[in-house]
């Protein structure tokens, strides 16, 4: 099961007493700010959670799995996430849900 933006909005609605519209807008604004920072080449640091970084990957050789033809995989920028120590600890110590 995955946590969705709609579920995050619902949680804010229930726990903070915000209107559903305000809760949804807060979640959307949060993610829009994360996107904006990454688009501008900035690192996103969320204390106690982790860091979103940008990494440039060089061009490299690849292969079309259907034809076996060699094709270059173009250079690109990717987003990476490194969990913080608090998040790592909580995940390691959590009991698995079945």
UniProtKB/Swiss-Prot annotation:
PROSITE patterns named among the record's database cross-references: HISTONE_LIKE
Family matches, as Pfam families: Bac_DNA_binding
What GO biological process terms does the UniProt entry carry, in alphabetical order? DNA recombination; positive regulation of metabolic process; regulation of DNA-templated transcription; regulation of translation
Positions of region (Disordered): 49-70
UniProt GO molecular function: DNA binding; structural constituent of chromatin
Q: Which UniProt keywords apply?
A: DNA recombination, DNA-binding, Transcription, Transcription regulation, Translation regulation
Question: Is the Transcription regulation keyword given for this protein?
Answer: yes
Q: Which GO terms describe its cellular component?
A: cytosol
Give the superkingdom in one word: Bacteria
* NCBIfam families the UniProt entry points to: himA (TIGR00987), PRK00285.1 (NF001401)
Family of this protein: Belongs to the bacterial histone-like protein family.
Biological function:
This protein is one of the two subunits of integration host factor, a specific DNA-binding protein that functions in genetic recombination as well as in transcriptional and translational control.
Listed under subunit, the entry gives: Heterodimer of an alpha and a beta chain.
Please state what the protein is called: Integration host factor subunit alpha
Q: Which organism was this protein described from?
A: Sodalis glossinidius (strain morsitans)
């Amino acid at each position: 099961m995955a946590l969705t933006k709609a579920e995050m909005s619902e949680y804010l609605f229930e726990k903070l007493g915000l209107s559903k519209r305000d809760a949804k807008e807060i979640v959307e604004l949060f993610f829009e700010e994360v996107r904006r920072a990454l688009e501008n080449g900035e690192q996103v640091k969320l204390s106690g959670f982790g860091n979103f970084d940008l990494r440039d990957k060089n061009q490299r050789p690849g292969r079309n799995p259907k034809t076996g033809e060699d094709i270059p995989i173009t250079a690109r920028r990717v987003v990476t996430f490194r969990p913080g120590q608090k998040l790592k600890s909580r995940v390691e110590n959590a009991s698995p849900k079945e």
